[in-house]
A protein has these predicted regions:
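Sec/Tat signal peptide C-region and signal peptidase I cleavage site
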Residues: 19-22
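N-terminal secretory signal peptides that target proteins for export/translocation
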Residues: 1-2
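Extended, hydrophobic alpha-helical segments in both membrane/secreted and soluble proteins
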Residues: 243-245
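Bacterial N-terminal signal peptides
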Residues: 6-17
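N-terminal alpha-helical interaction modules that lie
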Residues: 24-241
Length: 245
């Protein structure tokens, strides 16, 4: 073996020979800084626990969704469009996409309280998440909601339990009876919206759907003629309103 080849073999062997690990070379444990300790865990949101689940991709304005009128206090035109799209999707029981639309509205106008109300509406079957979103709406009442929007948010506060499955007094109650009482309070609060805004057909539509849902846990529909009258008022103003679902 010539000298040049011997040198190459020696270098090759040294490269693969296990090197001793000195104490000072060992990886030191990462010290947790104040900044890192405040960061959310992977997959979690800076905005709060309720945002950890649900849609991740941004919403888009979908064509041919129909149209409704739901004025809000936002000055952002696209936020307004996403609010109305979210309500259209609520009427169609398209809850995931509805939450996505309301989330997009909140991204465009973070202080818009009614956007968080919409997220709560889209999660009525998940009281913990609904309460998280509703608390976000309530925290923005003074600066992010007009009088009418405040009525919607305060009405929903009657329906969503304050601390789902944690209130000891509620545990002693019959769950169905508790839901019935909350639904009755919600319907009463929604009717107050119509007292002040008698032309608000979205309030009428939401009352109708809540009456239908609440009937399952004991809130009796005492007059189907009254329900039909509400629907007729809705369709008289908007024949294509999604309440026909």
């Amino acid at each position: 073996m010539n000298a040049s080849l011997s040198t190459c073999v020696l270098i090759f062997c040294i490269g693969f020979y296990p090197q001793p690990i000195l104490a000072e070379d060992r990886e030191k444990p990462t010290e947790q800084t104040t900044e890192s300790s405040e960061d959310p865990l992977a997959g979690h949101s800076y905005h709060g626990e309720a945002f950890n689940e649900g849609p991740r991709q941004a919403a888009i304005l979908m064509p041919e969704m129909g149209s409704i009128s739901f004025p809000t206090s936002t000055e952002n035109e696209n936020a307004q469009r996403f609010i109305e799209q979210g309500i259209l999707q609520l009427h169609g029981f398209w809850y995931l996409e509805s939450e996505r639309s309301f989330r997009q509205a909140s991204k465009l106008d973070p202080n818009l309280a009614i956007a968080y109300w919409g997220m709560a509406m889209a999660n009525q079957n998940n009281a913990t998440r609904a309460r998280g979103f509703l608390d976000e709406a309530l925290s923005r009442l003074d600066e992010g909601a007009d009088e009418r929007e405040q009525l919607y948010i305060k009405a929903l506060d009657q329906l969503i339990p304050k601390k789902p499955n944690e209130n000891e007094k509620d545990k002693d109650k019959d769950e169905k009876e508790e839901k019935k009482q909350r639904a009755e309070r919600y319907l009463s609060a929604m009717e107050k919206i119509l007292d002040q805004y008698p032309e608000d057909i979205e309030a009428k539509a939401l009352i109708v759907v809540q009456m239908w849902m609440a009937n399952g846990y004991g809130v009796k529909i005492t007059s189907r003629y009254a329900v039909d009258a509400l629907l007729n008022e809705i369709f008289a103003k908007n024949p294509a309103h999604p309440a026909h679902h």
